[in-house]
Amino acid sequence: MASSDLLSHLSATDRALFWKYGVGAEVSVPFQCVHHAFEFHAKSNPQLTAVDELGTTLSYGELDRRANCLASRLRSVGVVQGSRVCMLVERAVTLPVAVLGILKAGAAYIPLDGNIVSDSTLKHALVDSGSTVALTLRKFEHRLEGAPVPVVFLDDAICPSYNPSHCVKPRDTTTSKDSVYIIYTSGTTGTPKGVHVTHGNVTNLICIEPGQLGMKPGVRVSQMLNISFDFAAWEILGSLANGATLCPRGKTSKDWKAVMRSVDILFSTPSMLAPHNPVDYPNVKTVVVAGEACPKALADTWGARVKFWNACGPTEVTIANTMQLHIPGDIVTIGGPTPNNTAYVLDENMRPVPIGQTGVMWGGGAGITKGYLNLPDKTSERYVRDPFANDGSMMFNTGDLGKWVSNGTLQHLGRIDNQVKIKGFRVELDGVATAMETCAGVTGATALLIDGELWGFVKPSNISPEDIKAAAHKVQPYYAVPSKILTMDHFPETANGKTDKRVLQQMAIESKEEEAKLKEEKAAIPENVAWISLPPTVVTAPKTELTIPHRPSDHSLGSTNTKISAQVKEADSSASSTSELEKQEYIWSGYQDDDHPEKTQGRLVRNLRHQIFSLYRRLFSVVFIVNAAILIWICVKKEYDANRIGGIVIANVFIGVLMRQELVINTFFLIFTSIPSSWPLFIRRTAARVYHIGGIHSGAGVSSLLWLCLFTAQATKEMINGGKTSVRTVAITYVILAELLGIVIFAYPALRKRLHDTFENTHRFLGWSALALVWVQFMFLTIDYLPEGQMLGQTLVKTPQFWLVIILTCSVIWPWFRLRKVDVKPEVLSNHAVRLWFDYVTPPAGTFMRVSDAPLKEWHGFAAIPIPGRTGYSLVVSRAGDWTSKHIANPPTKLWVKGVPTYGVLKLVPMFRRMVIVATGSGIGPCAPAIFEKRIPMRVLWTAPNVRETFGDKLVDSILEANPEAVIYDTRKHGKPDMVKLTLRLVKEFNAEAVAIISNQPLTEKVVYGMMSRGIPAFGAIWDS
């Protein structure tokens, strides 16, 4: 019991409530070890499904067998009771095998996601944890090159035998006090700290209610979270320890939603859950959120339809030591202590505060972990003896502020120390201040989290905010660089001579209010004017004179107000800011001197492979060779009459037209880009070049022209010699030949560029008239060769060419059936570009649309830019000819559209795990959908002159919001870069699998060749038609 001194200051009521509220119920835990709970269900119900990854399943019996196999393999390479195994895997059906195999071997696992964990954290965890071995997948083999421990591959460790006696579980002496896992908490100062968690810590949460959350056989449980996050242990181990079915979410947003729709219990952070509407997930019965503060609106929305649990607890108290079942309309709290745990709210002297008053939250009981690995001083600082339990157990200082509310639950009120969460990451404010102090000339700095935004305060006042951010960005990741900076000559002080952070906070609030006034003045412009006619103006944030009064103190009573000159720079203000990334020349500083991978193979072989015999040309050649073989065959057989050659002409025209049909193109793209990113890279890099299918179109087009020349010659010969071919057929043939020659001549790249309008007109009208004449020629030729006594209709229906001509005609006509005139909402970005908004359809990412103001004369294709969560799409039209210049000067309010959204080269993005996306100028338009969609980690490189003046703050800011580490290179300021070398730097830094580029033809070909010749998959548009 607690000594009377610790509770003597409380009223009798508060003393009673201290015990009532702060001590959880005593409940017996049925299992002492996590894997023992799993084995109970594996033995009781071996046929039940343990894991279901989008249809790939493992039963409890098979999972148990595989885990035993892995445990035996680990024992054979030196793993013993008490060992630690670094587990570098990913969210998949194999994850439970790895976890249980390690536990059955008597070891603890260190969970690291091979797709996410940084090299520095991986190296630190391997050494700091004292791992006996590293367990990984073959796909992550490169990440463990030079590892200081043996590497075991999960892919190879499972024996093929289905005989349960083949791999016997090793002798098990694990107890509740042994380690189950070690979680490395993220930090921005120093190195990550490993937290030692025991089996007893975990089973106390997952094997009894409420932490059990109703998990039982037949219940489906989501596995949505990063496996390195301790919250993920709740869903993974909780499901397996209770006989439920664990459902990993897959790699795409489509898979993610499919899993969410299929589960009964959903684990999530509030940020992950926020975009989703519970109406869309009727199967979900229970949701538990943790990891960050939960907004009331989110809790109310989901709480109205499901059991909505809000949980809280740092890693050091085992995932969560308080939980609350939210009732819509009530305040959001984190509940009370879970069974066998305690929760205290104490003052600075470690005495309980009265109910309703704010203090520091401490946790105690069965969830308290062993402490920090290899950090005894840090452990003794945060873990202390629990004087209230008085049984020798420990309690932990969470560093969080909270208070007990009247219903006996805790209200979380933020952190008392300098560690905060920003965008889901832990950030040490002192580390941010230290990073800002690395800027030349800075004499002092501090950082505060104010209304969810990271602010930096720096002295003296003559330091550029952009220089401060550049310096901080060299030390800290993007999320730990202040988005707003205030510079001043002196910091306000408290009575004790310390920096008065309350006054600094007030300064920040007043500067935000001043900025809000400026925005309100801009917003007063009528909406229709803002949409159309005013190009954005980039202004510099003004110097703001702020008068901040000191709070009275012993040495400042009666003092006058202190005037502080503060320079405000807001990184997220579209009117007054430029992203720090646009101004940090160090990102590309010295890139031309980087050591780059050598080009593979000899120069001749490289050029043959990547330039002369590109996949496009190989497909062209295949079509051409097939036609050559057909020519040889009919010559040998002497079956080259005009009728047969005419059929071959039609077959080639059919293929050429169909390979440009929107539905056919989309089908090719959907099939080839559906290959998952888990497949070997050589398969994915080949399938991703599906956009080279234009080679089939060109091959068939050229072949049809050559066959038409042969047909013309043969038909003329037959006509002269009195054969079957009539004069009218030959006459029509010469007209068709002339039209096709005209199309081919104007399609020649040099002429097409110089005479683009002429090309458009000839290509369209000669193509239409040629199609009509093909019908006439076909009918004439059929009549010429009509067998005696047979009706024309009977012959036609039996002739394959007749049906080919019908199909290709329908293919050409079909898009015109989807012709419509739609409303356009223009947004003028500058005198160089306009953004056109449409709301009649929402196309998928990676597609382009055709628009026109004169549908019978010309059509123009632009990348469609859908915004996630918003109906409709936009197009970015930049100055590149008469048509674009006309619509930038006079933005349209209506345009014609036809056909369906058609996929382009960036449909391939989800096939890769990490990519560098390169765009020059308006090439950012086709790239934007993939950037906004955020389906994979990517690094964006955008080069253009004066991007904000050219494309406007709104587009630039949206790109930076979706990809905060995007590199924006101002060619007006820095000149034209060496795009190959700059791209190679980003590929190396980002550890990218592949590169995609949207640019002009010469630069696209240069970058693609520069990457491919070094073994890096690269993709860019083909200019073939």
UniProtKB/Swiss-Prot annotation:
NADP(+) binds at R685, T686, A687, A688, S769, A770, L771, Y840. It holds the Pfam family AMP-binding. InterPro entries: AA_adenyl_dom, Adenylate-forming_domain, AMP-bd_C_sf, AMP-binding_CS, AMP-dep_synth/lig_dom, ANL_N_sf. GO terms for molecular function: ATP binding; oxidoreductase activity. Residues 556-638 are annotated as: Thiolation and peptide carrier (T) domain. Its EC number is 1.2.1.-. Keywords: ATP-binding, NADP, Nucleotide-binding, Oxidoreductase. AMP binds at V332, T333, H412, L413, G414, R415. Transmembrane segments: none annotated. Residues 38-422 are annotated as: Adenylation (A) domain. It is an enzyme of class 1 (oxidoreductase). Residues 682-900 are annotated as: Thioester reductase (TR) domain. Adenylate-forming reductase, a natural product biosynthesis enzyme that resembles non-ribosomal peptide synthetases, yet serves to modify one substrate, rather than to condense two or more building blocks. The A-domain preferentially accepts L-serine, L-alanine and L-valine as substrates. The natural product of the enzyme is not yet known. Belongs to the adenylate-forming reductase family. This is Adenylate-forming reductase 03009. It comes from Coprinopsis cinerea (strain Okayama-7 / 130 / ATCC MYA-4618 / FGSC 9003). The lineage of its organism: Eukaryota, Fungi, Dikarya, Basidiomycota, Agaricomycotina.
